[in-house]
Amino acid sequence: FSMKNFHRRAKLEDPEENGVFKYRPRYYLYKHAYFYPPLKRFPVQSSSDSSEENGNGDSSEEEEEEEENSNEEENNEENEDSDGNEDEDSEAENITLSTTTLGYGGDVTPGTASIGLAALQLPKKAGDIGKKSAKEEESDEDEEEEEENEENEAEVDDNEQGTNGTSTNSTEVDSGNGHSGGDNGEEGDQESVTEAQGTTVAGEQDNGGAKTTTSPNGGLEPTPPPQDISGTTLPPSGKTTTPEYEGEYEQTGAHEYDNGYEIYESENGEPRGDSYRAYEDEYSYYKGRSYNSYGGHDYY
């Protein structure tokens, strides 16, 4: 079986020309632009404005949710120490969400995710008072729907935090499972982040940013050299095979140079480093025919 069968393409017009199949390579980079299928569009990475985060109109809804969440945090005042922990919370959210947030089509785009979150979090700290008036102007139906969504998200976060409370990557699992990107409820995230701060942020600082291992020595855990294995089972370096098997097996690397590799096969007696039998067979296959798999006179 050869690749020749893939190069055959029957023409529909005249069957006489079909009798001899021509070699027509497929062009994967086309000459003209209109032959291409429509390409997948990716979101443009922009740090200027948060409304251009996704390239489509989703960011306005995300901003409304962020306003809602920030105002509800002010009204509830569940975390009195939220001002002290706000920087650490935002850092932890940026770290975890930028690694686990999926971009368009399942591809991880950490740059856009972190930039979008930073741009969405800046107004939460700066201009809360202006957003209260903006929130009062919103319709009551939108507020009720968003409150229901936030309650559901907070319940999901609490359940996941109950299961993953002790593991070091609990906030990563939360942000990966529950939500996508900027749509997560700030309340649920702040609760989970403050609960898991003792584990997650400390674990990240101890590891030096390496989240895969739990070693406290900074960075990834180095694999120790297998001392006992090299001490017990490996043979000494001079021998290649153990003396029991010397009769059965052929020793390959025992001598410095093996004269069996010097083979004078060609007529001129030129030495070759190794026997070229496979190459000679392939070359003799291509003798008398051209390398494109159909010579002109083969079929006449």
From Swiss-Prot:
<dbReference type="GO" id="GO:0007155">
    <property type="term" value="P:cell adhesion"/>
</dbReference>
<dbReference type="GO" id="GO:0030282">
    <property type="term" value="P:bone mineralization"/>
</dbReference>
<feature type="modified residue" description="Phosphoserine">
    <location>
        <position position="51"/>
    </location>
</feature>
<feature type="compositionally biased region" description="Polar residues">
    <location>
        <begin position="93"/>
        <end position="102"/>
    </location>
</feature>
<feature type="region of interest" description="Disordered">
    <location>
        <begin position="41"/>
        <end position="258"/>
    </location>
</feature>
<protein>
    <recommendedName>
        <fullName>Integrin-binding sialoprotein</fullName>
    </recommendedName>
</protein>
<feature type="compositionally biased region" description="Polar residues">
    <location>
        <begin position="229"/>
        <end position="243"/>
    </location>
</feature>
<feature type="compositionally biased region" description="Low complexity">
    <location>
        <begin position="46"/>
        <end position="58"/>
    </location>
</feature>
<dbReference type="GO" id="GO:0005576">
    <property type="term" value="C:extracellular region"/>
</dbReference>
<keyword id="KW-0325">Glycoprotein</keyword>
<feature type="compositionally biased region" description="Acidic residues">
    <location>
        <begin position="137"/>
        <end position="160"/>
    </location>
</feature>
<comment type="subunit">
    <text>Monomer. Interacts with integrins; the interaction promotes cell adhesion.</text>
</comment>
<feature type="glycosylation site" description="N-linked (GlcNAc...) asparagine">
    <location>
        <position position="94"/>
    </location>
</feature>
<keyword id="KW-0964">Secreted</keyword>
<keyword id="KW-0091">Biomineralization</keyword>
<comment type="function">
    <text>Binds tightly to hydroxyapatite. Appears to form an integral part of the mineralized matrix. Probably important to cell-matrix interaction. Promotes adhesion and migration of various cells via the alpha-V/beta-3 integrin receptor (ITGAV:ITGB3).</text>
</comment>
<dbReference type="InterPro" id="IPR008412">
    <property type="entry name" value="IBSP"/>
</dbReference>
<keyword id="KW-0765">Sulfation</keyword>
<feature type="modified residue" description="Phosphoserine">
    <location>
        <position position="90"/>
    </location>
</feature>
<feature type="compositionally biased region" description="Polar residues">
    <location>
        <begin position="161"/>
        <end position="173"/>
    </location>
</feature>
<feature type="modified residue" description="Sulfotyrosine">
    <location>
        <position position="299"/>
    </location>
</feature>
<feature type="modified residue" description="Phosphoserine">
    <location>
        <position position="293"/>
    </location>
</feature>
<dbReference type="Pfam" id="PF05432">
    <property type="entry name" value="BSP_II"/>
</dbReference>
<feature type="modified residue" description="Phosphoserine">
    <location>
        <position position="46"/>
    </location>
</feature>
<feature type="short sequence motif" description="Integrin-binding motif">
    <location>
        <begin position="272"/>
        <end position="274"/>
    </location>
</feature>
<dbReference type="GO" id="GO:0030198">
    <property type="term" value="P:extracellular matrix organization"/>
</dbReference>
<feature type="compositionally biased region" description="Acidic residues">
    <location>
        <begin position="59"/>
        <end position="92"/>
    </location>
</feature>
<keyword id="KW-0130">Cell adhesion</keyword>
<feature type="modified residue" description="Phosphoserine">
    <location>
        <position position="59"/>
    </location>
</feature>
<feature type="modified residue" description="Sulfotyrosine">
    <location>
        <position position="300"/>
    </location>
</feature>
<feature type="compositionally biased region" description="Polar residues">
    <location>
        <begin position="193"/>
        <end position="202"/>
    </location>
</feature>
<feature type="modified residue" description="Phosphoserine">
    <location>
        <position position="139"/>
    </location>
</feature>
<feature type="modified residue" description="Phosphoserine">
    <location>
        <position position="60"/>
    </location>
</feature>
<feature type="modified residue" description="Phosphoserine">
    <location>
        <position position="266"/>
    </location>
</feature>
<feature type="modified residue" description="Phosphoserine">
    <location>
        <position position="82"/>
    </location>
</feature>
<feature type="compositionally biased region" description="Basic and acidic residues">
    <location>
        <begin position="125"/>
        <end position="136"/>
    </location>
</feature>
<keyword id="KW-0597">Phosphoprotein</keyword>
<feature type="glycosylation site" description="N-linked (GlcNAc...) asparagine">
    <location>
        <position position="169"/>
    </location>
</feature>
<keyword id="KW-0730">Sialic acid</keyword>
<feature type="glycosylation site" description="N-linked (GlcNAc...) asparagine">
    <location>
        <position position="164"/>
    </location>
</feature>
